[in-house]
From Swiss-Prot:
The lineage of its organism: Eukaryota, Metazoa, Chordata, Craniata, Vertebrata. Keywords: Glycoprotein, Lysosome, Membrane, Signal, Symport, Transmembrane, Transmembrane helix, Transport. SUPFAM superfamilies: MFS general substrate transporter (SSF103473). Residues 1-20 form the signal peptide. GO terms for cellular component: lysosomal membrane. It catalyses: estrone 3-sulfate(out) + n H(+)(out) = estrone 3-sulfate(in) + n H(+)(in); 25-hydroxyvitamin D3 sulfate(out) + n H(+)(out) = 25-hydroxyvitamin D3 sulfate(in) + n H(+)(in); cholate(out) + n H(+)(out) = cholate(in) + n H(+)(in); glycocholate(out) + n H(+)(out) = glycocholate(in) + n H(+)(in). It is found in: Lysosome membrane. It holds the Pfam family MFS_1. Its main location: membrane. One of its GO terms (biological process) is vacuolar transmembrane transport. It comes from Pongo abelii (Sumatran orangutan). The chain crosses the membrane at residues 74-94, 102-124, 134-156, 171-191, 198-218, 262-282, 295-315, 325-345, 348-368, 383-403, 416-436. Belongs to the major facilitator superfamily. SLC46A family. This is Lysosomal proton-coupled steroid conjugate and bile acid symporter SLC46A3.
Amino acid sequence: MKILFVEPAIFLSAFAMTLTSPLTTQYVYRRIWEETGNYTFSSDSNISECEKNKSSPIFAFQEEVQKKVSRFNLQMDISGLIPGLVSTFILLSISDHYGRKFPMILSSVGALATSVWLCLLCYFAFPFQLLIASTFIGAFCGNYTTFWGACFAYIVDQCKEHKQKTIRIAVIDFLLGLVTGLTGLSSGYFIRELGFGWSFLIIAASLAVNLIYILFFLGDPVKECSSQNVTMSCSEGFKNLFYRTYMLFKNASGKRRFLLCLLLFTTITYFFVVIGIAPIFILYELDSPLCWNEVFIGYGSALGSASFLTSFLGIWLFSYCMEDIHMAFIGIFTTMTGMVMTAFASTTLMMFLARVPFLFTIVPFSVLRSMLSKVVRSTEQGILFACIAFLETLGGVTAVSTFNGIYSATVAWYPGFTFLLSAGLLLLPAISLCVVKCTSWNEGSYELLIQEESSEDASDRAC
């Protein structure tokens, strides 16, 4: 008897992803620090290796380290761009016919291989530049975007009512927040008490358990309910893949097509800003004047991850008194406020207070996915989430690369510039949502519109 709950897989994968990101950044930071100059990095200190006096030679040295780390992150992200785009789009698109488990399994294998490589890299002190090669190879198996896309499609397959989709997706975001919050809070203690080697080994073990659960315990309703088993060549498969993507937009009426494109644009522009700025927080906190150590960085990550919990509570409460689109507006404008506050944060207290407006940052992610799923047919959910994941992979890598490049170029004269730029860029999804609102967005009316189009298609086929 197979289990139809994907939540345990999401739990383990979120733990691994949340722990990997800050650990890898700080590991690379320490390696570059030690290899760039003759300064030793003290891991027992209660403060970070950070000089606040601008006339000190160490201050110029740490600015150089910041630039090198930012550039290396840029190289890593670009190395996984093309294989990640191709694998994400293909794996999620074919999941409509071959089941949601396949992309979950392959992306989990890639994540496990990457974490094992991190263990070896740390234990044998291999050149850290080899991380670029592991990122490139791991991206061929899919990435976390592929995994989340498959999980969301898996959940949508089981939801019959539209309101149920919004709540269920919000529950997943809540679960992500709970895991990432606790993991982020403890990440500094992982480094301090266990070191990088054992921490990476724990990540690999959790990913191995996750893979075992998906392979042997998780059921696949799409594959089990599929009544046809068509064998086709590789070229025919690719043609069918792109044809279904084309038909997703072609079969829609003019108004629904316009709305679909507009919602995709809103989702990706918001994703671009939020994901692009995320890695900059750690570099910003390590640098002067904050000079945070690994424990404070863990606290900051935990506060950032708390937005998953507060976003879930916000969606749960707001869904009784307002539409999805109004919740998305709240999330965008509060995030914009947080970006501006972060840009001017110069003390630890100010930086913690700057995290408060980010409480509803995840709300737009949940409600925009839900809004998108409401304007397509049930048979188009897989290809829709493939498009979303493809655009998120492209947008995410481009965003991280862009923001790392901007931060590297501006850190010397004003580190907070990147956050001010992010606040300005958030006007794009806000304006786009205003246009959606002006088209008289109504969830029930679009449900009826889809039903009418489906009945028209059925009558055309009957004729």
